Amino acid sequence: VALQASGYHVVCLPAQDKEAVNVGLKYVNNDACYPAIISIGQLVEALESGQYDLDNVSVLMTQTGGGCRATNYIPLLRKALNDAGFSQVPVVSVSMGNKGVESNPGFKFTLPMIKRLVVAFLYGDLFERVVYRTRPYETEKGMVDQLHQDWLKRVEANVRNGSLTQFNHFMKKIIRTFDEIPLQEIKKPKVGVVGEILVKYSPTANNDIVRLLEEEGAEAVVPDIVGFMNYSLYNQIWKYENMGMSKQSKRLAEFAIKIIELVEKPMDKALRKSVRFDGIHSIYDMAADASKILSIGNHTGEGWFLTAEMIELLKHEVNNIVCMQPFGCLPNHIVGKGVIETPWTTPAPLG
């Protein structure tokens, strides 16, 4: 919606798409990481559907620029498109100007677009918090999902206009509505979901882990996606202090984190005042906690942030954690599975 309001005719591919895995395996070597197979498979599958004019369509994919193989998804995608007979389809790389990524003259981040994207991400994190916290306890099946859908329709215009003032108005109403919805007076075990970013959030990639946990009688707790953005920015500060990166990049990162914190502050305040919901974690506090277990120089994959998320979950009495590890994602096996026992056995980070 945010990109459509910015003048781009964007189609968001479905979150549930099992066939994408089979298509991806046809055109991507099975030694590549699972997220690459799924995301490239979805794009090729969409072009094969016949719904798009192949001479007037582009495919859009994010590119990180870090040590993760997500940096190399673009050439993998181009090869897949060529092998599938779609060599004429342009590939647009979406990045925040990181080193090692491609530039696209036809696609630019403008201030109005950034505001719309910020509002969209804030709503995404907010709905994830309130829905996952209340749905396992609903007194009537489907009640929370219906309320969620009703609010999605109401806030769509706000995503299009990018107004933070209107967001804050709706945000307080959403929290109040979900705070007052009648729930069963029972307590279920909480299960945190961490891991590689695509597998953590994509129902196709994680076999709809949130619904599965709820069906098994648990309450799923999934960390915010804005936290991952703060993690990426915080890494620029660490690189300046430890690897000689430019002071300008450090200042830009600090400024961006400050802006994000400023934008999130009203939501954090409203969440903390509520009965059912917890506030937003500071990236600086998370880095300090994680540094007691591993080096903040671990930036590949989800890096130190994955460990930090586990610590935050434990600090909020979420004592069960599912760590989503995609096949072939070597960095996450180290910073995820490699340290998963440590937060429980190291009392210092939880103090």
Q: Where are the predicted features?
A:
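An N-terminal assembly and electron-transfer interface module characteristic of large anaerobic redox
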Residues: 1-351
